[in-house]
Curated annotation (Swiss-Prot):
The keyword Amino-acid biosynthesis applies. Keywords: Amino-acid biosynthesis, Aromatic amino acid biosynthesis, NADP, Oxidoreductase. GO terms for molecular function: NADP binding; shikimate 3-dehydrogenase (NADP+) activity. Its EC number is 1.1.1.25. Involved in the biosynthesis of the chorismate, which leads to the biosynthesis of aromatic amino acids. Catalyzes the reversible NADPH linked reduction of 3-dehydroshikimate (DHSA) to yield shikimate (SA). This is Shikimate dehydrogenase (NADP(+)). It comes from Geobacillus kaustophilus (strain HTA426). GO terms for biological process: amino acid biosynthetic process; aromatic amino acid family biosynthetic process; chorismate biosynthetic process; shikimate metabolic process. Transmembrane segments: none annotated.
Length: 276
C-alpha cells in the first residue's frame, strides 16, 4: 500500500517539498506520495490527530506551526526540544516523534557545498529568530572555535547565547558586528532581509570583509541576493539557501525511509523551479 507523507503549514501552496520528495520516492522505487496540507492556526491539534487516525507515515511542519505541534506529539528529540521547534514528524505505529532537521541540514549543506570542515572556524550568525536558533544550536555541535551572534535587537542575540554556550559565543549589535567582520571565516545571514520582493536591502555592510571568507545566505528567492553579489565582488566564496532547503528535506526523507536521496538531483529540481 502506498504510504502518505506531507507538509503541514499555512500557507503551503508555494512549497517545493512535493517536487523534491515525490521525485526521490519515484527514483528509489518507494511506494509513497508527498502532499500539501494547509492547516489554519486553530486546527493544529486536529491535524496531528488526523496524522495518527489516518496512518499518515510522516509529515514536515512549516511556518507557523513548528512550535504549536509540540504539545500534540508523544516524543520530541533532544535537539528539537533545545531549539523549541519541530519540522519533521515520524509516525511509528501511532506514536508521533518530532525532530528538527533545519539547522542540521544547513550545516551539512555548508560543509558539503563549500567542501570544508567547520573545525576551528570563527563564524558570525546574523539574526536571532527561528532560523537562527536552529542553525546556532546545530553549529554548537560542531568543532567550530567561535559562533558569535549579531542582531538588530541585541537582547534577542544575548538570550540565544545564554541558552547556548557563553564560552564559545559572544553577541553584538549589527553596527558592532560590521566593525568586527575581518575576524570571521564564515558569515551567515539567517534573516529575511534581501528576500523577494524587497531585494534591494542588505542585512549587514560588507565593507570590512576579507577576501576568501565564506558568505552564506539562507534566502533562495532570489537565488543570488544583492548581499551575496556584493560579497562575491569583494572576493568571498558564496552560498545561497537552496542547500539548506534541500538538505533539511533529505534528512527528513532519510528519517522516514532509511534511504539517502540524490541531493544533487533535488537541488537541480529546486533551482529549475525557482527560475521559472
Amino acid at each position: 500500500m502506498e504510504k502518505v507523507y506531507g507538509l503541514i503549514g499555512f500557507p503551503v501552496e508555494h512549497s517545493l517539498s512535493p517536487l523534491m520528495h515525490n521525485d526521490a520516492f519515484a527514483r528509489l522505487g518507494i511506494p509513497a506520495r508527498y502532499h500539501l496540507f494547509s492547516v489554519e492556526p486553530g486546527q493544529v491539534g486536529a491535524a496531528i490527530a488526523g496524522v495518527r487516525a489516518l496512518g499518515i507515515a510522516g509529515v514536515n511542519v512549516t511556518i507557523p506551526h513548528k512550535l504549536a505541534v509540540i504539545p500534540f506529539l508523544d516524543e520530541v528529540d533532544e535537539h528539537a526540544r533545545r531549539i523549541g521547534a519541530v519540522n519533521t514528524i515520524i509516525n511509528n505505529d501511532g506514536r508521533l516523534v518530532g525532530y528538527n532537521t533545519d539547522g542540521l541540514g544547513y550545516v551539512q549543506a555548508l560543509e558539503e557545498e563549500m567542501n570544508i570542515t567547520l573545525d576551528g572556524k570563527r563564524i558570525l550568525v546574523i539574526g536571532a529568530g527561528g532560523g537562527a536558533r536552529g542553525i546556532y544550536f546545530s553549529l554548537l555541535s560542531t568543532a567550530a572555535e567561535r559562533i558569535d551572534m549579531a542582531n538588530r535587537t541585541v537582547e534577542k542575540a544575548e538570550r540565544l547565547v545564554r541558552e547556548g554556550d557563553e564560552r564559545r559565543s559572544a553577541y553584538f549589535s549589527l553596527a558592532e558586528a560590521e566593525t568586527r567582520l575581518a575576524e570571521y571565516d564564515i558569515i551567515i545571514n539567517t534573516t529575511s532581509v534581501g528576500m523577494h520582493p524587497r531585494v534591494e536591502v542588505q542585512p549587514l555592510s560588507l565593507e570590512r570583509l576579507r577576501p576568501g571568507v565564506i558568505v552564506s545566505d539562507i534566502i533562495y528567492n532570489p537565488l543570488e541576493t544583492k548581499w551575496l553579489k556584493e560579497a562575491k565582488a569583494r572576493g568571498a566564496r558564496v552560498q545561497n539557501g537552496v542547500g539548506m532547503l534541500v538538505y533539511q528535506g533529505a534528512l527528513a526523507f532519510e528519517k522516514w525511509t532509511g534511504q539517502w536521496p540524490d541531493v544533487n538531483r533535488m537541488k537541480q529540481l529546486v533551482i529549475e523551479a525557482l527560475r521559472r
